[in-house]
Structures are given as structure tokens and as C-alpha cells.
Amino acid sequence: MRMIDIIEKKRDGHTLTTEEINFFIGGYVKGDIPDYQASSLAMAIYFQDMNDDERAALTMAMVNSGDMIDLSDIKGVKVDKHSTGGVGDTTTLVLAPLVAAVDVPVAKMSGRGLGHTGGTIDKLEAIDGFHVEIDEATFVKLVNENKVAVVGQSGNLTPADKKLYALRDVTGTVNSIPLIASSIMSKKIAAGADAIVLDVKTGSGAFMKTLEDAEALAHAMVRIGNNVGRNTMAIISDMNQPLGRAIGNALELQEAIDTLKGQGPKDLTELVLTLGSQMVVLANKAETLEEARALLIEAINSGAALEKFKTFIKNQGGDETVIDHPERLPQAQYQIEYKAKKSGYVTELVSNDIGVASMMLGAGRLTKEDDIDLAVGIVLNKKIGDKVEEGESLLTIHSNRQDVDDVVKKLDSSITIADHVVSPTLIHKIITE
């Protein structure tokens, strides 16, 4: 088999066999196939696309290029959730203890964040003493005992994806549905999930700006999952404004605690209940979405979800008293109110710009080596559709420096106030095939 033949075959619009895809991925990881041939094939895929069988084969070739996490010692159906990312996306922090409270095992492998704010692990590390460096045996034991544990990414998972992703980044082949879908799904499958719930974001603060693109990606990932024996479904949710009100690590953790108490923002609560209901059904803990939703609401109202979060924090060395004493979380030195320059209704909150503003305060990383300030960030006091009076606070800047003129300038271009009301949509579609 020759790589040049595989490139020409895809260039001319033909279907690649599983053997050809395995030959490419295997050879590329070993270094037998050079970057220039891999980038040539990536560009051919970009223009000629792949069918469902090719996408599934590419995903599994990347899964098999490295280690797979074995979660077979954990009792029950392991359901994982993946979000394509957004601003203020606190769902994992709420979902993990919430679904665990209704007996769904959550064995979560998470990373650190690049971009607007930290990842799930950075947010949890805002809790004094919390650690994620636990061995596999302890991880399995914690999930079996308490139904939830979070561990840092370790081992040699999907090395082919890491290599191909870096190549796509510099060869103009990032925005290819088969390449994005196989990249995301290979990581989820290698992490040991039996079933997968996907939260595909669309809008100004999302990777997929249009609903059409988000749908195409959601369908692609759901089909890959179902084709390789993992029950998979996707929700397409809106990221035209940040989710919830908090953007920043300790601030988002505080918001997660409020949500588990039943006092969280409406949009975050609704998205968590929608995603959580799907997870509960896939884990065979409820027969219908309505029944699953009722179980989750009861877990919040009874305090079981909050109690689960406390035990989870304690199990991983953290100070669980932060649940009742949020002032023990990292606090920024200055709170600066950003006020409305006129009266009207909020019609636009550009997620990316608000994310960048929080990053300028120190809440996110530009490179893996950067330190982040867990205390800083932005809290939205108004969301799209809210009425606002001139001089009223639109948002609060939590900062460890007094001069935030650069941040204010960024925010000036990210908020629009008009004289008409806009009603935002939160959940656009649910995709099951």
C-alpha cells in the first residue's frame, strides 16, 4: 500500500477503506508518513468530505493509536458529556454531582483550559487542597463509592489526534466536519465512555458560528458514536451570549454551587437539566426524559446534589466548607461596576469579546505555560432581553488591578443596548441520529 495512492484516491472523490485509513494513521504516528503527505490527505478530505463509514474508521484508528482508559471495573453505564466550548460554560461542574446524585456514574477526565477561562480542573483547583492527580485504582474506587470523580488527563491517549490537530492548525484544514468530528469523538471513546452526550454550541461565542454548521457537526459526531457502539446524542445550544452570569474560575465555581442549591441562573439551570436528563436516560436510570428531569429536580430540591458535590470535593482533598462559606474561595481585590451609558434593552453581548476581557484580567491562558488568576473575571448583571436604565450596572469586573481601562474599552464594543426587546433561544435542536 502506498500513501500517494490513498491521497489520489481521496483527491478524486472516492471512498477510502478501513485498511487505507489505518495505514495512514499508523504510518503517520510512527513517523513513516511525512507531514507533507498527511497535510495533502487532510486537504483532500477537506474538499471531498468522508462518508459515515470513513469517519467511524478514522475515529477508531485514532483511538487505537494510543492507550484506552479501562473503566470496566466501574459499575453501570458510564455516560460522558462533551461541550464544544464557550464562554462561562459551567455545565460540567453542575452536571457531574447532579447526575451522580441520581446514581449515574461520572468518571470524568478533564483538562486545563486554553482561552477565555480555565478548564474544569482549573475551576476545581480554586478550592483549597483539591487535587486531580489520582491513580486509576483510586479513581475507579471513588466513582464506585460516590459515583463521581475527576482526574487530570494522563497516559498516551489519541497521539494520532494530537499530531493531526497540530498539522491541521497550520495547513488551513481545521474547519472540516469529518476531521473535527473524528478528533472530538476519538478523545471521548479513548477516555472509556459507554455513552456520550454532546453539547454543540452555536453563535458568536462558539466554534460553529451558524446553526447549519453546528447541525452538520452534531449529526457527524452522533453517527460516529452510534456506528462504533457508543450510544450518542447531541444538543445544539446557543452561545450568542455567555452561559449563566459568571466568567472566571472561582466565580464560575460559585455559580455552580448556587445552581446546585436551586438558585442558579435560568439558562444554566435549564441547559444542565436538558443535558442531565439525556445522561440519566442513556445510563438506564429513567425510561423517559420527563422522568429523568423530575429525578434531577428532586436531587436539587432535596439537597442531595449539593451533598454529592461536598463529598466529591472532600474525597479529592478539597476544603468542602467552601460550599457553605463561598468567601473562602479566591476573592479579587477590586470590584468595578461597568454601567449602562443609556436606557433600553440589552440586545447583544458578544461572548468572545467578554471572554477576551476576562482573559485580559488574567482569568485565562494564551499558552499552556501561563499562570491564571483564579479570583478574577466578570459577572453579568444583565443578559440579552433585560431592561436597563442609564447608569445601572451591566456587569461587575472582578480584578486584582485597579486600572482596568483596557478591559472597559474591550467591553464597550461587546454590549449593545437598543429600544427593542430581543428574546434569546437557549436550545435550538436535539440530534439523535
Swiss-Prot record:
Catalytic activity reported: uridine + phosphate = alpha-D-ribose 1-phosphate + uracil; thymidine + phosphate = 2-deoxy-alpha-D-ribose 1-phosphate + thymine; 2'-deoxyuridine + phosphate = 2-deoxy-alpha-D-ribose 1-phosphate + uracil
Top-level taxon: Bacteria
Keywords: Glycosyltransferase, Metal-binding, Potassium, Transferase
EC nos: 2.4.2.2
Co-factor requirement: K(+)
Database matches in Gene3D superfamilies: Nucleoside phosphorylase/phosphoribosyltransferase catalytic domain, Pyrimidine nucleoside phosphorylase-like, C-terminal domain, Transferase, Pyrimidine Nucleoside Phosphorylase, Chain C
GO cellular component, one term: cytosol
The keyword Cytoplasm is assigned to this record: no
Cofactor binding description: Binds 1 K(+) ion per subunit.
PROSITE patterns reported for this sequence: THYMID_PHOSPHORYLASE
GO molecular function: 1,4-alpha-oligoglucan phosphorylase activity; deoxyuridine phosphorylase activity; metal ion binding; thymidine phosphorylase activity; uridine phosphorylase activity
Residues reported in the UniProt entry to bind K(+): G88, T90, L243, A246, E255
Ligand binding (phosphate): K81, H82, S83, T92, K108, M109, S110, T120
InterPro entries, per database record: Glycosyl_Trfase_fam3, Glycosyl_Trfase_fam3_N_dom, Glycosyl_Trfase_fam3_N_dom_sf, Nuc_phospho_transferase, PYNP-like_C_sf, PYNP_C, Pyrmidine_PPas_bac/euk, Pyrmidine_PPase_CS
Chain residues that bind substrate: R168, K187
GO biological process: pyrimidine nucleobase metabolic process; pyrimidine nucleoside metabolic process
Quaternary context: Homodimer.
Function: Catalyzes phosphorolysis of the pyrimidine nucleosides uridine, thymidine and 2'-deoxyuridine with the formation of the corresponding pyrimidine base and ribose-1-phosphate.
Family: Belongs to the thymidine/pyrimidine-nucleoside phosphorylase family.
Listed name of the protein: Pyrimidine-nucleoside phosphorylase
Organism in which the protein naturally occurs: Staphylococcus aureus (strain COL)
Taxonomic lineage of the native organism: Bacteria, Bacillati, Bacillota, Bacilli, Bacillales
Name of the gene encoding the protein in the UniProt record: pdp
